[in-house]
Amino acid sequence: MAEVLLFEALRQGLQEEMDRDPRVMVMGEDVGHYGGSYKVTKGFAERYGDLRLLDTPIAENSFTGMAIGAAMTGLRPVVEGMNMGFLLLAFNQIANNAGMLHYTSGGNFTIPIVIRGPGGVGRQLGAEHSQRLESYFQSVPGLQMVACSTPYNAKGLIKSAIRSDNPIILFEHVLLYNLKEDLAEEEYLVCLEKAEVVRPGNDITILTYSRMRHNVLQATKSLVYKGYDPEIIDIVSLKPFDLGTIGASVCKTHKVLIVEECMRTGGIGATLRAAIMEHFFDYLDAPILCLSSQDVPTPYSSPLEELTVIQPNQIIQVVEQLCEN
């Protein structure tokens, strides 16, 4: 066992897959000799050379399209978006090419591409660098989406994503890169379609992912002290949802709270709430509540920035409200 930071876990997983499979390559802005904006690819330029680690111009549409073409012709590219907000510049390539080409080619092409990078509200990164784009890509047919929240699942997810023949977006949160965890030296994978039951409980199901997992766990300390027994599930897979794990919890607790950093209007929480209502309505004893970020651009001011995202005290209040009714 060795203590590893989340960005180091991503690096380990990526390195293991590049060592295992010579078809795996990385491209993006500053991923080469600089080592990536958050040092996930540090040392890779010397280890793998310029053919497998490609520094690109600042042109997301161009290098994302190039990566999709590389995937169509047999490579397994990993694209690093320096910031998830910049992927809007490549939305056409991701939506109309990566997501659809397997279908529109009649199955003649697979697109084994991984698109990864940091997003979410950081510390005064400003509106354009604090984007949460999960729901933008959720509606694209053919894409899979996962979100890491710990060093353990970050490493396992990136390895599984690289081995998949589907186009996958791996969402990483900018504030979690320095999160520490002891990881075993043995190889492991994390299922791309499976939610994680972080804490079993009986009173209420709390569904969350990414950074909000840690806000929920912080709130849970106070909730347990007050006598509540929440079940916490990190949904991990943002598309498709693991309705088996989620449904089993809903049928047990009969109450659901969704906690996300995505925007309230059209966010992941809204889609997840609709899915639960469709499949498990008869098991609910109360309305599903969803705590989401405010529908505003993220302010630069630190106090205002904090007000736009969900805090542990808000989670405590809503759990008490649901459990007392």
From Swiss-Prot:
Its cofactor is thiamine diphosphate. Its main location: plastid. Transmembrane segments: none annotated. GO terms for cellular component: chloroplast. Thiamine diphosphate binds at residue 60. It is found in: Plastid, Chloroplast. It is an enzyme of class 1 (oxidoreductase). Heterodimer of an alpha and a beta chain. The pyruvate dehydrogenase complex catalyzes the overall conversion of pyruvate to acetyl-CoA and CO(2). It contains multiple copies of three enzymatic components: pyruvate dehydrogenase (E1), dihydrolipoamide acetyltransferase (E2) and lipoamide dehydrogenase (E3). This is Pyruvate dehydrogenase E1 component subunit beta. It comes from Zygnema circumcarinatum.
